[in-house]
Amino acid sequence: MTHLRKTHPLMKIINSSFIDLPTPSNISSWWNFGSLLGVCLVVQILTGLFLAMHYTSDTMTAFSSVTHICRDVNYGWLIRYLHANGASMFFICLFLHVGRGLYYGSYMFLETWNIGVLLLFAVMATAFMGYVLPWGQMSFWGATVITNLLSAIPYIGSDLVEWIWGGFSVDKATLTRFFAFHFILPFIIAALAGVHLLFLHETGSNNPSGLSSDADKIPFHPYYTIKDILGVLLLILALTSLVLFSPDLLGDPDNYTPANPLNTPPHIKPEWYFLFAYAILRSIPNKLGGVLALILSILVLAVIPFLHTSKQRSMMFRPFSQCLFWILVADLLTLTWIGGQPVEHPFIIIGQLASILYFLLILVLMPITSLFENNLLKW
């Protein structure tokens, strides 16, 4: 008798996605991050749901409602810090997942990659709006600075900003709509992640060698389910360690001060996972130019498949491209550091050079190096 999982309409979908899915036999731990991102999303939705039960999206009570969650709600402090640090874990997994895609040429699956870029934008938008909700100093001023960037759009800019604010400044209307969007976006992200998987399963997974693995496939369960569970356990260990030992390590002390429109903090900066983009934004003295550079710093990922000039898919056997890849990683770490520094002498020029190098590596140096490597192999 055929298994129920192969005949039942719902079980059939689960079976073909997570049980009998033919998977390359040689995918490494770098392929674990997809499932880890799924776990992160579930954790964020669940903790967010419980936080929303106690949070009030009103400028007068938002800050005190977060304080109430931490002090009076049963395990409220745990839920709040799991949610805040869960976002950091989410972005760590995201960056590693994208890095894996770049290194092993997974971007050649065009639909999967483009939906991934869309997901990255959606997660960044969600995280930004979530950072505004506690209504601390950095929440308020971060919202003011980032939404104000839209005023750089010619002709409609200032109207657009006031439309987003729901008034003439960041106020009650802004907070309420940010809460509404912050609540709904994770469900849109979950739906997009489903489409992401749908397109991935059309082609099957890539593997470290970048070669076709059609001749050597194994079922996803039990091999990769066990492997994914190990990854999940390590993620939970890292997250709980962070939450229970140093929950404020990645936060900003300014956000423990209630929002005050009359007092600007000395250094306005976003959460650590946006610092690289923030550094690119600040490296251009012109407002519109900075906004375009900020958007392009993420959108450039969508161009990468069209700049693939190598005859090989993966970087596994391309040492020169590997060198450039790790220079790109170092450059992003440099940008992250610069984004958290004040705008003064050594940091300005370092940020500008790192920003130029970022675009130069992706758009020019990597494609040229790939062509050079083709010639080395007489292809």
Curated annotation (Swiss-Prot):
Residues binding heme b b562:
83, 182
Give the family this protein belongs to, as stated in its UniProt record. Belongs to the cytochrome b family.
Q: Which cell locations does it reside in?
A: Mitochondrion inner membrane
Where along the chain is a ubiquinone bound? 201
Q: What does this protein do?
A: Component of the ubiquinol-cytochrome c reductase complex (complex III or cytochrome b-c1 complex) that is part of the mitochondrial respiratory chain. The b-c1 complex mediates electron transfer from ubiquinol to cytochrome c. Contributes to the generation of a proton gradient across the mitochondrial membrane that is then used for ATP synthesis.
Q: Which cofactor does it need?
A: heme b
Q: Which CDD domains match?
A: cytochrome_b_C, Cytochrome_b_N
User: What membrane topology is given?
Assistant: Multi-pass membrane protein
Entry GO terms, CC: mitochondrial inner membrane; respiratory chain complex III
Q: How does it assemble?
A: The cytochrome bc1 complex contains 11 subunits: 3 respiratory subunits (MT-CYB, CYC1 and UQCRFS1), 2 core proteins (UQCRC1 and UQCRC2) and 6 low-molecular weight proteins (UQCRH/QCR6, UQCRB/QCR7, UQCRQ/QCR8, UQCR10/QCR9, UQCR11/QCR10 and a cleavage product of UQCRFS1). This cytochrome bc1 complex then forms a dimer.
Which additional comment does the entry carry?
Answer: Heme 1 (or BL or b562) is low-potential and absorbs at about 562 nm, and heme 2 (or BH or b566) is high-potential and absorbs at about 566 nm.
Q: Name one GO molecular function term.
A: metal ion binding
Q: Where does heme b b566 bind?
A: 97, 196
Alphabetized, the UniProt keywords read:
Electron transport, Heme, Iron, Membrane, Metal-binding, Mitochondrion, Mitochondrion inner membrane, Respiratory chain, Transmembrane, Transmembrane helix, Transport, Ubiquinone
Any binding details for the cofactor?
A: Binds 2 heme b groups non-covalently.
List all membrane-crossing ranges: 33-53, 77-98, 113-133, 178-198, 226-246, 288-308, 320-340, 347-367
- Encoded by which gene? MT-CYB
Task: Give the protein's recorded name.
Answer: Cytochrome b
